[in-house]
């Protein structure tokens, strides 16, 4: 069957892993675990990414160019905007559950480590969504074994390796002569975006789309992404 959730592209929620782990070699057992993760599912990083699509659709509604499906999407965008207001970049409830799931799988898969009294060193960047991701993971482990001792920290001291910013790498990725740079500068997206079908679903006047919505603009792409996210 087709998983429609994958239409969200890199905004799709990570699937819960179901594959069996490779057992340890005979005569060996786990004694230490080092885990490095990204934060869980988050809201869009800028509130304007919710506001701009809504304003575009609101203007289209005022001009009477929304289709019946466009009206439905407009209503959904209103709901999404109200729910997401003030949450730009925050960890979502899904994101919190993802990290609780990671903590639970750690406990289930490595009882030799987490089934006894040990110390857990848990660190994150200073970004709120990362801190809360870490905390949810630790809370899940704590609920499964009250004998675990946690050291939690979120400090600029550790940012150099957790969220490293390499100026030379950024310069290389921004080089227009490199094919790879197209992905990071947005030109690849511009060249591969074909929104005509979606625009016909949302709007009943394609001249309006071309001259007002500008489907290949940042706002137009945001409308498409919000539609996929729903």
For the regions a protein language model found, what residue spans apply to each?
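Signature for phosphate-centric chemistry
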Residues: 1-119, 127-230
């Amino acid at each position: 069957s087709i998983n429609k959730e994958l239409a969200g592209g890199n905004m799709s929620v990570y699937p819960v892993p179901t594959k069996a782990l490779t057992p340890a070699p005979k005569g060996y057992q786990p004694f230490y675990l080092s885990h490095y993760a990204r934060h869980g599912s988050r809201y869009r990083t800028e509130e304007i990414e919710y506001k701009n699509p809504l304003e575009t659709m609101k203007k289209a509604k005022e001009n009477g160019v929304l289709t019946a499906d466009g009206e439905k999407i407009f209503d959904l965008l209103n709901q999404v905007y109200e729910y997401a207001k003030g949450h730009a970049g925050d960890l979502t409830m899904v994101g919190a559950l993802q990290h609780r799931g990671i903590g639970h799988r750690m406990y289930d898969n490595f009882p030799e480590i987490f089934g006894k009294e040990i110390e857990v060193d848990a660190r994150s960047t200073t970004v709120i969504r990362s801190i809360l991701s870490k905390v949810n993971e630790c809370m899940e482990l704590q609920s499964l074994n009250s004998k675990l001792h946690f050291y939690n920290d979120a400090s600029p001291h550790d940012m150099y390796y957790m969220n490293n910013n390499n100026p030379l790498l950024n310069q290389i990725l921004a080089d227009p002569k490199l094919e790879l740079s197209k992905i990071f500068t947005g030109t690849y997206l511009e060249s591969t975006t074909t929104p005509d079908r979606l625009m016909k679903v949302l709007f009943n006047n394609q001249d309006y789309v071309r001259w007002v919505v500008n489907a290949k603009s940042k706002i137009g792409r945001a409308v498409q992404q919000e539609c996929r996210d729903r």
